[in-house]
Every structure is written in C-alpha cells, then in structure tokens.
C-alpha cells in the first residue's frame, strides 16, 4: 500500500483529484510495557505499516470522511456545527475527537475537507491503529489549516481524545512513538518528565518479527483500565509510608523494601511489574547501545514473563506464540507488545532463520489455537508526515 492507492480511492469516492496525501505509522514497543501511565520509561519505534490519507477541499463547512477499512460505513459527514456532538460509535469518532480538541485549543477550520483513509495496520492487533489515525488527523488539520501546534501538542491532543472522548485511560506512548518516530531509531522516553532520546536500533544480522495472534482486542472493553486502576491503588498504599509520585520512580530494591505497605497480593504483582519493567527498559536500552544483543534479548523475554505472570495481560494466544518463538533457532528474545489481551507479539530473530521461524511458529499456533497467525518483518520508520 502507498499514497497512489489512496489518491486513486479518493477519486473513485469523491469524483475529483486529491490535493494532498499524508501518512501516520503504527508502532511497536521494544520494551517498557504498561509503564507509560506509571511514570516509567518506554522504548517504542514507529513502523512502516500505518495509515494513509488523501485529502481535498470542499465548499461545505464539513468533514466528509471515508475509510476503505470500513467500506460498509460509507461516507460520513461531520458538519463543523456537529463537532461537539456525542460520538457515534464509528471509526470517525477519532477524527471528530481530534478535530474538537484542536478546535478548543484554537484551530480555525476555514473550509471543509474530503478525506479518504486506508491503512494496512490490522485493526485491533495492538499496533496502535487508533493512535495512528489520531496522529494522521492531527497532522492533516495542523498542516492544512496552519494550526501552528508543536508535535508534542498533537501527541497530548491524541491522549486527550483517548482518555476523555473514547474512554480509554491510556498513557502517552502510542501517540508519541507515532508522531515523533525516526527511521531506524527507537525513542527512550521518560513518561514522567517527557524527556526523550533517540537511540539507533542496530540489530546486526537480526530482524524484528511481528506475530499477530489475529485475536482482536478492544482496549475499552479489555482489562486495560482495570490494570491502571490497580497500579493507582498500589501507589496510593505506598504513598502512606514513603514519598513517591509514581511507581516509575522506585528502584527494584526500594519496591521490595516497601511491599509490606501493599496488603493486597494482586496489587503487589501489578506494581512489581511496573517497577521492574521500568528498570528492565533502562537496562535494555543500554544493552542495545552497547551492542549487547544477547542481554537485550534476555530482557525482552523477561518482560514477557512479567507481563504473563505479574501483570496477567497475555492469554493463550499470545502465550502460544511467545512460547513457541523462544523454542526456535536464531531467536534472541520474544514477548507480547502493546496492551495485551490478544493483539501482537514480537521476536528478535536471526535473518537467516526467519523463514523457518515463521513456518514452525505458525504451524504450532494453528495446531494449538485452530486458526492462523500472521507474521510481518518490521521496518522502523519515520513518524506522521505529509507526503506531497
């Protein structure tokens, strides 16, 4: 898929030529899962799969929207006068949410837009298709209406849409990775301070393989919000005995010394993941900088174990992929990526072994689960941008 596909689709739907094309990537997180809302570090990167848009003006004061990913929905009109109406339960809620947040922040929409969207991110697979759409919309509206918003402002607008409009208490990682991505680099982001640095992802003879369970997951309907609430409860208990603003501020030793303050064993497990995952992320980013891929892979796998047993956000589909991935020749590490409860996992695989890896893991998954997983070799890409 490329920009030519969406310009052709635009003409078919709207009967005229598109004037602009845009792209926003998806993302994977190398390590640092469920730490972004706990004041910890994350280590994501944008990928070459993503969401494209072809855009043209119209004479109506309305956004006229079509997605090739949801063809049965057809063209949806959102008049400017309806921006602050309730959401409709459609993909267009993400467009409407971004538009209303930007309008509130001072954006001036001077004319209507026809927008044709098509993406090659599997919907609900944990590669941040919703955040990709949000950052795509933010880039379109910021560029075409001279909004003047900085990239980090667009990131925060996207988070606000998720939290206040869609109803998902997500952190900042997805929107940040998609808006700020750079080719062949991952971003070590401290979500507590929003300080970040780009680090080259040099895998030598290895590649990152994305493994899609093809079990669709819904953030708002999953236990994502429950996990965040559990971490907040654990933090509140710790704060009765020690001075700490977020779980991400604690070292492993500090946490172990103060677990007596958390009298619920489930909450201890949830908080332990947040604290130890943050430290794993720092160690992993250093290992990657040092070229120590063996240590990096071990930390990635340790993250997966913690997500399965302390945070309990995997399930049989993800566990089957990761367990079988780690049995294969040429694999340095593997774990689920994203929020969990279905979606995708990643594995670091020697490029010479990728074909056998996909065959073997795919066969084991099909035998255990009863349907196919899908596999993609990830290219680390630039962030959201205008293409023409």
From Swiss-Prot:
Enzymatic reactions: alpha-D-galactose + ATP = alpha-D-galactose 1-phosphate + ADP + H(+)
Similarity comment text for this entry: Belongs to the GHMP kinase family. GalK subfamily.
Active site, renumbered: 174 (proton acceptor)
UniProt-annotated site: Transition state stabilizer, residues: 27
GO biological process, one term: galactose metabolic process
Location of the protein in the cell: Cytoplasm
Protein name listed in UniProt: Galactokinase
SUPFAM superfamilies cross-referenced by the UniProt entry: GHMP Kinase, C-terminal domain, Ribosomal protein S5 domain 2-like
Species of the source: Lacticaseibacillus paracasei (strain ATCC 334 / BCRC 17002 / CCUG 31169 / CIP 107868 / KCTC 3260 / NRRL B-441) (Lactobacillus paracasei)
């Amino acid at each position: 898929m490329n920009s030519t596909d969406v310009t052709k689709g635009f003409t078919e739907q709207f009967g005229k030529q598109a004037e602009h094309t845009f792209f926003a990537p998806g993302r994977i997180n190398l390590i640092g899962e469920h730490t972004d809302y706990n004041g910890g570090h994350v280590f994501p990167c944008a990928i070459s799969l993503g969401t494209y848009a072809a855009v043209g003006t119209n004479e109506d004061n309305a956004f006229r929207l079509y997605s090739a990913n949801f063809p049965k929905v057809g063209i949806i009109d959102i008049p400017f006068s309806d921006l602050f109406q309730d959401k409709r339960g459609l993909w267009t809620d993400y467009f409407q949410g971004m538009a209303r947040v930007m309008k509130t922040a001072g954006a001036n929409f001077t004319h209507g837009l026809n927008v044709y969207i098509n993406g090659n991110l599997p919907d609900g697979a944990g590669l941040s298709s919703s955040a990709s759409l949000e950052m795509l919309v933010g880039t379109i509206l910021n560029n075409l209406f001279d909004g003047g918003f900085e990239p980090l402002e667009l990131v925060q607008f996207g988070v606000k849409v998720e939290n206040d409009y869609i109803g998902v208490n997500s952190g900042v990682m997805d929107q940040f990775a998609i808006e700020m991505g750079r080719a062949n680099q991952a971003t070590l982001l401290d979500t507590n301070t929003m300080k970040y640095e780009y680090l080259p992802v040099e895998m030598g003879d290895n590649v990152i393989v994305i493994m899609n369970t093809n079990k669709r997951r819904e953030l708002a309907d999953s236990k994502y919000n429950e996990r965040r609430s559990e971490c907040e409860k654990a933090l509140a208990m710790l704060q009765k005995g020690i001075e700490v603003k977020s779980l991400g501020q604690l070292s492993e030793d500090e946490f172990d010394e103060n677990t007596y303050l958390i009298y619920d064993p489930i909450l201890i497990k949830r908080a332990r993941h947040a604290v130890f995952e943050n430290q794993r992320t720092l160690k992993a980013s250093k290992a990657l900088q040092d070229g120590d891929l063996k240590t990096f892979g071990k930390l990635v796998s340790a993250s997966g174990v913690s997500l399965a047993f302390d945070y309990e956000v995997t399930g049989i589909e993800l566990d089957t992929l990761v367990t079988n991935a780690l049995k294969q020749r040429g694999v340095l590490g593997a774990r689920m990526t994203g929020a969990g409860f279905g979606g995708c996992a990643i594995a670091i695989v020697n490029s010479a072994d990728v074909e056998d890896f996909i065959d073997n893991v795919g066969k084991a998954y099909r035998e255990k689960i009863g349907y196919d997983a899908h596999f993609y070799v990830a290219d680390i890409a630039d962030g959201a941008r205008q293409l023409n």
